[in-house]
């Protein structure tokens, strides 16, 4: 039953549609015995990240970022919650470093594993646009607006495009509002899967 629920959370056709998790991530979550709710969360955030990277590519084609890294990071950012189950239903950050170590231990490069540790650390001067996009996807999937995070994304976009920060803010605000409009459906999807089976 657990494997069937996990498979549904990662791959089933849905209304509204969510992209399935990448095969590499789905295989890892199956191997780890991921709680179905975690897989559902990762799928929702991955789908939102996909919308964000498509928007950046269309809105600002000159902006340099690693599309595949952002998508992988969004799909695995909370993988450490497979060992810190209490953080699926309550606050905590132990899953961040644990997730990075878990991914590296399963052969994932440190460059990709870092998102598990950086997705809540957007104020760190070492994070790049890729990290910020993963962090943003992890917030906006549930329509949570974080002005400090959004300001950092706006600044990176304005610097890369040469457009005024207010122009970048208006454009980003528009896409975040559109993505946020479907938050209730994504939250309901996640909540439809159990933590413990």
Locate each region found by the language model:
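A generic short-segment signal for beta-strand/edge and adjacent turn/coil regions
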Residues: 13-14, 39-42, 100-105, 110-112, ...
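Charged phosphate-binding loop/patch that engages nucleotide di/tri-phosphates or the phosphate backbone
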Residues: 167-197
């Amino acid at each position: 039953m657990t494997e069937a629920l996990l498979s549904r959370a990662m791959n089933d056709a849905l209304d509204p549609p969510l992209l399935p998790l990448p095969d590499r991530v789905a295989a890892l979550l199956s191997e780890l015995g991921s709680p179905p709710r975690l897989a559902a969360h990762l799928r929702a955030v991955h789908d939102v990240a996909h919308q964000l990277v498509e928007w950046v590519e269309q809105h600002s084609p000159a902006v340099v970022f690693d599309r595949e890294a952002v998508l992988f990071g969004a799909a695995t950012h909370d993988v450490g919650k497979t060992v810190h189950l209490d953080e699926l239903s309550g606050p905590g950050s132990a899953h961040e470093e644990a997730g990075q170590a878990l991914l590296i231990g399963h052969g994932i490069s440190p460059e990709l594993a870092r998102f598990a540790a950086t997705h809540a650390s957007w104020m760190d001067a070492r994070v790049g646009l890729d990290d910020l996009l993963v962090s943003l996807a992890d917030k906006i999937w549930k329509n949570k607006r974080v002005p400090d995070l959004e300001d950092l994304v706006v600044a990176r976009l304005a610097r890369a495009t040469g457009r005024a920060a207010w122009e970048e803010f208006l454009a980003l605000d528009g896409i975040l509002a559109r993505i946020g409009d479907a938050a209730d459906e994504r939250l309901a999807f996640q909540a439809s899967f159990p933590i413990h089976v």
